[in-house]
């Protein structure tokens, strides 16, 4: 057993506490007031958000959340806790002195509360693990900001490491290939859909699109697909600003007219299934594709708590720990 105890912060985006307009409004306020997510001038954005956007959006989003909510609660939080428990079990079996806690950038359990739990367990160092394979300032960058905000309140800052990205990690690519092979049929078109970001963020230096491309090319190389068998698109845009294109919903609407009748969609940027995959991709976008002449449509689930995914996560943590100890 290692003498030093390592604390791991497993961080995902976040989720409302319940599928109600009030809870969702509270969650969206925290999310959409983060300048990493929306960087409009505060004096313009806050009144618009509070007075118009949240009252309208919270009611609509509440219906969407209600459609995916389970007895255990939010799928995102439930799956992330499954990942936590699987990792903790693995580290115990391997006799590694590692404690894993779940944290969310927005909502609960917060990064602050997770760090407090690790503090009570007297960890000696930290590894912050944002569950975003492809770096973006609006996701991974936001995790770093939230983590740094907690550090500002501490006099005794523990040594820490930060997993920046893992978009071409061999274990990650292999896990994607395995799950695709389990679901994908040779006569289908394979669409890789990633959460979008404003083009303006890319112009300011965010290299998210390039990370997405590198992930897809690595997977395609392993699968041996030709150019006419796959595509790359970006989903979940909001507002009037231009986002990364092609847009997933528009791609799916136009695909049948391009002789693409059978569609399989995977979202490699999501480490756990959530609203954007279970409702937007699996339900809304399926309707778009079929309504425009598509014959069949399948959503390939996120890696979630698959054994290959857990092993990949464990390897990333152990590799980071080994690098630090050298």
UniProtKB/Swiss-Prot annotation:
Location in the cell: Cytoplasm
The entry's keywords: Cytoplasm, Heme biosynthesis, Iron, Lyase, Metal-binding, Porphyrin biosynthesis
GO biological process: heme biosynthetic process
Stored InterPro entries: Ferrochelatase, Ferrochelatase_AS, Ferrochelatase_C, Ferrochelatase_N
Entries under HAMAP family matching the protein: Ferrochelatase
PANTHER family hit by this protein: FERROCHELATASE, FERROCHELATASE, MITOCHONDRIAL
Family listed: Belongs to the ferrochelatase family.
Record-given protein name: Ferrochelatase
Organism of origin: Pasteurella multocida (strain Pm70)
Phylogenetic placement of the source organism: Bacteria, Pseudomonadati, Pseudomonadota, Gammaproteobacteria, Pasteurellales
